[in-house]
């Protein structure tokens, strides 16, 4: 039996953020612990605890962080809910009308050398949009382009 993992590790520097990093940690904690009362007031006025769905309960969110004086380090070793993390970060950025961006990469790994066990992606977040990049999708697109070109070349 193989174990599959998704891992990431990235930092958000306070000097590069135009929003309080503490709001991100507060939201991560509130959703991980399902504690609506711990959500920032501005957030409660806009969204509810259920907006991130059941996947944000502690055993599924699997996101750790460490808030230091100069930066917020966010990481996961196993099975993070990347979509919820991205939603949390973007919610904070939208609230503060951020003009900055956050980006990070993630890796899909496996404890055995399974052919379907490796890959990864990246995400780019700003207050108005989120863009994901997935290596598996990219490879499939390249194969499709190659195959289509072969068909066109035969004509």
Each model region followed by its residue ranges:
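Charged interaction segments
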Residues: 38, 43-155
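Short, extreme N-terminal segment that most often corresponds to the first beta-strand
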Residues: 1-35
């Amino acid at each position: 039996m193989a174990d599959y993992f998704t891992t990431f590790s990235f930092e958000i520097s306070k000097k590069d953020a135009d929003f309080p990093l503490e709001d991100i940690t507060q939201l991560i904690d509130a959703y991980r612990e399902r504690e609506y009362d711990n959500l920032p007031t501005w957030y409660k006025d806009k969204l509810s605890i259920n907006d991130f769905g059941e996947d944000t309960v502690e055993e599924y969110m699997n996101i750790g962080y460490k808030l230091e004086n100069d930066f917020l380090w966010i990481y996961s070793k196993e099975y993070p809910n990347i979509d919820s993390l991205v939603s949390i970060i973007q919610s904070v950025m939208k609230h503060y009308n951020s003009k900055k961006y956050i980006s990070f990469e993630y890796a899909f790994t496996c404890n055995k050398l399974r052919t379907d066990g490796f890959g990864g992606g990246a995400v780019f977040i700003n207050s108005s949009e989120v863009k994901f990049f997935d290596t598996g999708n990219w490879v499939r697109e390249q194969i499709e382009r190659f195959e289509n070109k072969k068909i066109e070349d035969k004509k």
